[in-house]
Design a protein with these regions (language model features):
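Active-site-proximal mixed secondary-structure blocks
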Residues: 1-34, 39-104
């Protein structure tokens, strides 16, 4: 379910550091991973972008895709998606198609 939010309040979605799902795409393959280490850096009024820092490492399959492609999508799941959010974080997209496995 999508909701419209005043972009000036976008930072409230990531303070204090919620658990999020981040999707990436590399070589035609989509992936999603669970992350809880992020923080807002600022908001650009001209572009409408909220700059966010995330903390992960090069060992992370999706982190490599983000470094290579310079893009990702951040999803803030609701409480009703808690079980799936946790489960997504227990497997690697290098071995499993998480979109297929979790019906995304």
């Amino acid at each position: 379910m999508y909701q419209t939010l005043d972009l000036n309040l976008a930072f409230t979605l990531v303070e204090p550091s919620p658990v999020v799902l981040i999707t990436t795409r590399d070589q035609g393959k989509d992936n999603v991973f669970t992350l809880s280490l992020l923080m807002p850096l600022g908001f650009d009024d001209d572009s409408g972008c909220c700059n966010i820092a995330i903390m992960t490492g090069r060992w992370n399959h999706s982190a490599r895709a983000m470094l290579k492609n310079k893009q990702c999508v951040l999803h803030v799941p609701t409480a009703e998606h808690m079980a799936d959010t946790i489960a997504i974080g227990t497997v690697s997209g290098a071995q499993v198609d998480k979109f297929d496995r979790f019906g995304l």
